Amino acid sequence: MKKSLIALAFGTLGLGIAEFVMMGILPDIAKDLHISIATAGHLISAYALGVCVGAPMLIIARRYPLKHILLVLVGIMMIGNLCAALASNYWVLMIARFISGLPHGAYFGVGSIVAEKLADKGRGSEAVSIMIAGMTIANLFGVPLGTALSTMLSWRLTFLLVGCWGIAILYYIWRWVPMVENLPDTGFKGQFRFLKTQAPWLILGATMLGNGGVFCWYSSPLLTQVSGFSAESLTVLMVLAGFGMVAGNLISGRLSDKYMPGRVAAIAQGMICVALLLVFFLAQISWLNVLLMCLCTAGLFAVSSPQQVLLIRYSKGGEMLGAASVQVAFNLGNAIGAYCGGLPLEVGLGYKYPALIGSGFAFIGFLLLTFFYRKYERTT
């Protein structure tokens, strides 16, 4: 495995912890800042807004070396998380979370392009999956560690840890990632030209709806209220889900190089659809629900690297914007899925019904990817 790809994965590890740890430390922040859980939840939205704003800003940096852009993005991540650790009140923390989100999509976009350029011939998807592996490891180890630090000591230490990790990322990107050839400058308008074609919209739509399908599904209350697991066992179950993410990401990276990435993504999306549908009908069978949970998380990250690679390949002239837009679609899916998944709970339906809605979202994502494969890949 190339050291340069490991350095890129260090970056997605830091971004993954920064994004997802908020779910675990939200109660501690709310208590410390004397705000409600609902108000504290807006800190998640602030990060997502930063992701959406930061990705298009890559257009400004299109003429700079890709390695230098990565270093600047890591620097912004450090500043945002260190400011969060030192935040004196809710609004300062809100701004810090917004700043922390700015480099997220941009880093994934630039990092994916660099990873594919550094890959051996015919192994571009696998290289991108190695970079994305940092995100899966963040969910497996980083988020539980950050949550434990918050519970035992202070939530500020969690953000401080991510900020300090940024120093290591800067060092290893500087040392291990070589300078790569710049992308051709197609001008400001040329960066958006790829959006006139159908292919990127199919991929982005599938990303948003497929991810939204998984985020519809309220896994923790389903496991405790329907499957009968204790609250204490959730940590172990979430680790199992994390292993599913790691496995799904790495396996799909290899398969995408052997077969068509659109085909692999469509199959993974179909797996999510079926798994969520089975959750709705069979969640009361505890061991089966755990297996289905792992299949869902594996599928979620099995579609990540193929979709990232596809956006690079089908956004000629605007590769950085195209690759970064995957994370924008991902975060929009988070918001839409969480909202729609909560609707059946608000009207008094059980915890199984969000999975049914999620299955519908995933099915539409599957149809979009299948259409993409048939139109753009099978005919080539």
Regions from the PLM with identified roles:
Residues 176-207:
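Juxtamembrane intracellular "pre-TM" segments in multi-pass secondary transporters
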Residues 262-307:
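C-terminal transmembrane helical hairpin of 12-TM major facilitator-type secondary transporters
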Residues 54-66, 248-260, 345-346:
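Helix-to-loop junctions at the C-terminal end of transmembrane segments
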Residues 53-91:
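Conserved MFS/SLC helix-loop-helix module at the cytosolic interface between two early adjacent transmembrane helices
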Residues 34, 86-92, 103, 228, ...:
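Helix-breaking motifs and short loop linkers at transmembrane-helix boundaries and internal kinks
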Residues 96-134:
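Cytoplasmic helix-loop-helix junction between adjacent transmembrane helices
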Residues 90-92, 121-175:
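Helix-loop-helix hairpin linking two adjacent transmembrane segments in secondary transporters
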Residues 80-83, 91-100, 287-295:
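Paired small-residue
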